[in-house]
Design a protein with these regions (language model features):
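Aromatic-rich, lipid-facing transmembrane alpha helices and their immediate juxtamembrane interface loops
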Residues: 1-138
């Protein structure tokens, strides 16, 4: 059971948003720091797991956030190819055998997707907590 289980869905959503903001800011600071990418990735992943464990704790949420953490950054590759944006210090090149160093990602992007997914789940639960089911449904 998560540490915040006794809190209302609204408070859990607020804590999820606040912790996501902190994790994304930490990602920025780690990107600009001299800390090795692997260490920064470990720190962010630990923060994400702490966020999930303390605010949610559901295995289904962990699976969903993990899938999004992997698939989200990969879904950015077409936009990087089109020149919509690029990363300042890409060190992860998932398509390197075919594209060389043209399509690079920051390894810190995945944990940000994880945190935002945990955030979205908490917001969804809060919004759903005030919704009454239609007649005939329970």
């Amino acid at each position: 059971m998560p540490a915040a289980a006794t809190l209302s869905p609204r408070m859990r959503a607020a804590l999820a948003v606040a912790s996501t903001i902190l994790l994304i800011k930490a990602s920025e600071l780690l990107t600009l720091s001299s800390i090795p990418a692997a260490a920064g990735l470990g720190l962010l992943l630990a923060g994400c797991v702490l966020q999930w464990a303390s605010l949610d704790g559901a295995v289904s949420s962990l699976v969903l956030a993990s899938v999004v953490a992997i698939g989200g950054p990969l879904a950015e590759l077409p936009f990087i190819e089109l020149g919509c944006w690029h990363y300042l210090a890409p060190t992860y090149f998932p398509l390197q055998p075919w594209t060389g160093d043209a399509l690079g990602l920051s390894p810190l992007t995945g944990p940000c997707y994880f945190a935002v997914t945990t955030d979205a789940i908490a917001l969804g639960r809060w919004l759903a907590s005030g919704v009454e089911p239609p007649d005939g449904y329970s």
